[in-house]
Amino acid sequence: DSFDQKYFAEECLSFQFTDGSKQVYCDWKKDGHGYVDFHQAIQKSVNIYFWEIALKIWRLYENDEKESLLQNYARDLGFGDYTGIDLPYERKGTVPDRELFDDWKITAPDRVREEGWLGGDLMNLIVGQGAITVTPIQVANAYANLIRGYTLSPRINIDYSASNSDLRVLRVDSEFKKMFLS
């Protein structure tokens, strides 16, 4: 009916996948966010912005080696691997891709659809949903790596008698504070 059409037109994005299936995605904010850039999309958690990126990657690179662009970036940030933190029982987490889904079809068929890896899985991945699994320390470390511009393994300082010379002052840009902490 017309109410449904108006609702979808004003509050949702409709994507047409290359396989012909139609998916409708709604944003969490009823009235939407208007036009946003990358920084605003992160700050306001605008999934639709990131879904658009994933969908572009899917449409351009489906079944191509570049299809794993997002996964490679996630791995560069430290997801899907051990951080090297000096604590026991650390988990690697999972960064899903076509190969993993193909493997799961055989080894864990209850974890994946018969169709395997689809564009919607990439859209889930980019917003941290679906088959991706991460640990809190991986998330914290990924943000730290982004801020630093290089990677380090996190450490737990259990020596409370450390001198002040062992402490490193972290200066955070005021624009960064404004963007992420407001």
Functional labels for PLM-detected ranges:
Residues 1-182:
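Beta-lactam-recognizing serine transpeptidase/beta-lactamase-like catalytic domain environment
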